[in-house]
């Protein structure tokens, strides 16, 4: 097993070296990079599902599905099945989740309870992964699809290398491929403040949040592109992390416009994972999760510089909401 892993790593580095050489030639001729990105959306049916009525959840999902179809953007949604179980609303919530597969989008597992591998331990986490499969597998099978992808809650992949390797082996044994993240603009934090503003009818704050979110996302893409080039010499097929919330439901098309202005085409997660960067050695372990560009940089002993500073005023508003009774 270890020999095969070593051979794969050497092969990946050789092919990456070829990609770097080609990319260098493109840079010298002034050619634009072939930018592609896969969209992944976490915390289905909704990040704030417990505080959201079935009617609001259904409306949000309908808007997001319509925007994805209109923009012709493929996506994979990662499910926390615990959020389906609210007294008197289970059927409606499952129906809202089924809209994803009925619209032709794939679902992945995000654990049942959004458990962090770093916090609950391996056995409890494994049980939560299994518990999070039941409804999702049924919905996918009804549309001749398989449950193929797993996304780590909080991007926590293990506090130590042994735990990480055991968790990885467990996921492979259940037929999963881990969905990495290379671009993350913290839409979950924007989304929480946005939903609060929407409930209170504060249209001015909603608009301010949207503009800040779109601007910050643009900065994060620029940072990820540059870090990629510093790390491997070219811009790989990126994977963007989003969350199921009303911010995305209401403004996804505007986000798409920002991304397209940077020259991106939207691709499937499967196509993105075909980029050889996702075969690079990755021994990242820590108390806190992070994106995979950081994984690879730290694995190579080159911790990255800090990314764009997240707007402090959004953080302060999010804290104030959490303190509100």
Listing of model-derived features with the role each one plays in the protein:
Residues 2-14:
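Bacterial N-terminal signal peptides that target proteins for export
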Residues 11-23:
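Bacterial N-terminal signal peptides
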Residues 24-28:
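Signal peptide processing junction and immediate N-terminal pro/mature segment
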Residues 29-155, 240, 258:
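Active-site beta->alpha N-cap acidic-glycine motif
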Residues 32, 72-75, 180, 234, ...:
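C-terminal domain-boundary segment and adjacent tail
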Residues 44-58, 121-124, 195-200, 206, ...:
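Acidic/histidine-rich helix-loop elements
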Residues 85-92, 112-265, 271:
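Catalytic domains of cell-wall/extracellular-matrix polysaccharide-remodeling enzymes
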Residues 101-109, 135-140, 203-222, 290-310, ...:
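Short, basic, helix/turn surface patches
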């Amino acid at each position: 097993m270890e020999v095969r892993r070593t051979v794969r790593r050497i092969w990946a580095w050789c092919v990456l070296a070829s990609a770097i050489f080609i990319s260098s030639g493109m840079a010298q001729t002034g050619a634009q990079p072939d930018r592609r990105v896969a969209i992944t959306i976490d915390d289905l049916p909704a990040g704030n599902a417990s505080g959201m009525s079935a009617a609001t959840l259904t409306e949000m999902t309908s808007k997001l599905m319509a925007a994805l179809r209109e923009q012709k953007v493929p996506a994979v949604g990662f499910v926390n099945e615990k959020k389906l179980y609210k007294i008197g609303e289970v059927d409606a919530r499952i129906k809202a989740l089924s809209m994803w597969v009925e619209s032709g989008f794939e679902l992945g597992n995000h654990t049942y309870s959004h458990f962090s591998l770093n916090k609950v331990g391996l056995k409890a986490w494994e049980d939560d992964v299994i518990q999070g499969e039941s409804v999702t597998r049924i919905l996918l099978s009804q549309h001749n699809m398989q449950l193929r992808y797993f996304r780590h809650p909080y991007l926590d992949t293990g506090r130590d290398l042994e735990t990480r390797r055991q968790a990885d082996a467990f996921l492979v044994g259940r037929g999963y491929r881990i969905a990495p993240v290379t671009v993350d603009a913290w839409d979950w934090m924007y989304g929480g403040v946005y939903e609060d503003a929407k409930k209170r009818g504060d249209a001015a704050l909603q608009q301010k949040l949207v503009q800040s979110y779109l601007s910050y996302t643009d900065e994060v893409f620029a940072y990820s592109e540059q870090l990629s080039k510093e790390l491997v010499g070219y811009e790989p097929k990126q994977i963007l992390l989003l969350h199921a919330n009303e911010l995305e439901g209401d403004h996804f098309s505007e986000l798409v416009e920002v991304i397209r202005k940077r020259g991106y085409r939207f691709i499937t997660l499967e196509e993105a994972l075909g980029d050889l960067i996702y075969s690079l050695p990755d021994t990242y372990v820590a108390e806190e999760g992070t994106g995979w560009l950081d994984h690879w940089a730290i694995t190579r002993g080159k911790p990255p510089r800090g990314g764009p500073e997240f707007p402090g005023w959004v953080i302060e508003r999010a804290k104030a909401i959490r303190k509100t009774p």
